[in-house]
């Protein structure tokens, strides 16, 4: 991390000292240099199965965090970008995007405010990393008896860990939680799993969110904005929080009737399933996916679990890649590279046009 940051800063310093107008290409090369190192590290921080690797990646990312703000606050780079005479509409758009990035990053603020803006931006990024880490490494499990897992497919049950008494030990990962909420017949068990999933990250993440909200407000104030919402949407199509709220109100009014009808349908299904008066049952968050799945099966005769047999994973992945090749004029080539889990597959992506042959990767 230290070495890569030093290289990036050296490249940035060299670009700042240049006098020519090819700043767009310089900016692009520097961005690629940073991303080629930073993105794989970010991926490892999120998915590596070894905690030591995740922790090392986290520490590395925290060292790299200040650089993006340093680029956005560079006065020499800002002056170079402003001096560029765009050759075409693409250059004009890129120039405008960069100018806005500089202005939003604090390049035009007085020195004291600029320094504080960098401190705030860096801390917000660190809070985000820690928030994600708390979610990814939450050790919470939900222990259920076999009876509480009634309704679950055999394949799902076979893949779950069990304790010495035969009880299921459920993690909070997507392949565990989503099928359970869709299929488990016990509303009490669904509630346990739903509550655990929605508390993922724990109380610590609530403190991080509170701190981030305060920092965002302070950042908006530094830029002369009344709140972070105004600061965040000023460059976007909506431009103002009022326009966003008006749009959301329009959407809500348009879907109110449909939402009420669908909720009534789900409540009716719950009443039928539980044998209660249709006017009685409350529909809770942990009920929704279960009764949506029941209604879907009854109305369309579609069973997601039954469909799995027709879409084996390996063949489905290859078909999707072949389809993408036809649609986008690209070519996927599988490679053997070091990966963080035995199930991970690596593909290089190439344009089909031979003279370009520009590689990417997934």
Feature locations, PLM:
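Second-shell loop/turn segments in exported
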Residues: 1, 103, 176-180, 198-202, ...
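Acidic, low-complexity proline/glycine-rich segments
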Residues: 1-3, 32-35, 82-97, 165-188, ...
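N-terminal helix-rich structural modules
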Residues: 1-152
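Short, charge-rich amphipathic alpha-helices with coiled-coil/heptad character
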Residues: 39-51, 181-197, 235
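Short, 15-30-residue, compositionally biased linear elements
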Residues: 89-101, 202-215
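Active-site-proximal, well-structured secondary-structure segments within enzyme catalytic domains
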Residues: 94-96, 118, 123-126, 133, ...
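Substrate/cofactor-recognition hotspot
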Residues: 133, 174, 188, 193, ...
């Amino acid at each position: 991390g230290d070495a890569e940051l030093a290289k990036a800063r050296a490249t940035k310093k060299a670009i700042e000292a240049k006098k020519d107008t090819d700043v767009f290409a310089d900016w692009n090369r520097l961005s690629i240099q940073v991303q080629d190192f930073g993105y794989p590290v970010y991926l490892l921080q999120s998915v590596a199965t070894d905690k030591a690797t995740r922790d090392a990646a986290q520490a590395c990312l925290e060292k790299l965090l200040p650089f993006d703000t340093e680029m956005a606050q560079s006065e020499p780079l800002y002056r170079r970008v402003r001096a560029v005479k765009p050759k075409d509409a693409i250059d004009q758009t890129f120039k405008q995007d960069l100018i806005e990035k500089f202005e939003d990053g604090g390049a035009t603020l007085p020195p004291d405010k600029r320094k504080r803006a960098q401190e705030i931006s860096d801390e917000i990024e660190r809070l985000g990393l820690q928030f994600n880490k708390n979610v990814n490494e939450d050790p919470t499990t939900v222990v259920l008896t076999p009876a509480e897992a009634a309704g679950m497919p055999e394949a799902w049950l076979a893949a779950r860990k069990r304790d010495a008494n035969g009880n299921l030990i459920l993690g909070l990962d997507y392949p565990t939680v989503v099928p359970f909420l869709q299929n488990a017949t016990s509303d009490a068990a669904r509630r346990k799993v739903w509550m655990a999933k929605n508390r993922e990250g724990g109380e610590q993440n609530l403190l991080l969110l509170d701190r981030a909200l305060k920092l965002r407000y302070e950042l908006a104030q530094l830029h002369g904005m009344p709140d972070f919402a105004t600061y965040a949407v000023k460059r976007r199509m909506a431009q103002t929080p009022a326009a966003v709220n008006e749009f959301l109100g329009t959407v809500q009014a348009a879907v109110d009737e449909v939402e009420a009808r669908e909720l009534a349908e789900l409540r009716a299904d719950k009443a039928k399933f539980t044998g209660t008066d249709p006017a009685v049952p409350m529909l809770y968050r942990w009920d929704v996916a279960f009764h949506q799945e029941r209604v879907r099966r009854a109305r369309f005769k579609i069973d997601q679990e039954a469909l799995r047999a027709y879409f084996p994973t390996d063949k489905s992945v290859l078909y999707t890649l072949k389809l993408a090749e036809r649609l986008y004029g690209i070519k996927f080539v599988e490679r053997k590279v070091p990966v963080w889990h035995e199930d991970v597959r690596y593909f290089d992506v190439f344009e089909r046009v031979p003279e370009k042959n520009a590689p990417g990767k997934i």
